[in-house]
């Protein structure tokens, strides 16, 4: 358990290294607007988002029974996130943005530009997180992931056997 605590502490310290004075000021504005909104009972919005989420792709190599991606049941446009759109958005927001979540329902590693996007965010000092089913984590891809600067990698295991996987 002490090793797990150490990993969490290292991750928390890494996250805090992303906090610049400008990002701290932005966070203070967002927090103040939240409390003023509650107190005044009317919406007040100061600051820019602290965290955003990008879905690198809606595609997935699995067919999880509860997932719109796995079921191919999206009611919205599908495909890969365009790298140019991503870069422009990061260039517009990076000075105030603290954290970028790189997943939703697709498998991020399917997008061929995924690790380049992670690197782009990392170079701008943004804390990056992704979740994967792990199928694309070969030794070479794992090395590229580390080199990209990804801060947190979540590997989702949705069942240890086919029966438990299919049970939900």
Regions from the PLM with identified roles:
Residues 155-157:
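Conserved phosphate-donor/acceptor-positioning beta-strand/loop module used by diverse small-molecule
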Residues 4-152, 163, 167:
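Conserved alpha-helical substructure of the radical SAM core
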């Amino acid at each position: 358990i002490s090793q797990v605590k150490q990993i969490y502490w290292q991750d928390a310290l890494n996250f805090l290294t992303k906090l610049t004075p400008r990002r701290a000021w932005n966070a203070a504005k967002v927090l103040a607007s939240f409390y003023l909104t509650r107190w005044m009972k009317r919406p007040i919005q100061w600051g820019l988002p602290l965290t955003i989420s990008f879905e690198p792709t809606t595609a997935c190599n699995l067919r999880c029974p509860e997932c719109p991606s796995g079921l191919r049941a999206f009611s919205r446009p599908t495909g890969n996130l365009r790298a140019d759109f991503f870069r422009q958005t990061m260039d517009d927001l990076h000075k105030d943005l603290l954290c970028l979540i790189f997943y939703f329902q697709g498998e991020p590693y399917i997008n061929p530009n995924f690790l380049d996007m992670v690197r782009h965010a990392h170079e701008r000092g943004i804390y990056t997180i992704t979740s994967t089913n792990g199928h694309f984590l070969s030794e070479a891809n794992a090395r590229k992931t580390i080199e990209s600067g990804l801060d947190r990698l979540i590997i989702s295991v949705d069942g240890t056997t086919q029966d438990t996987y299919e049970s939900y």
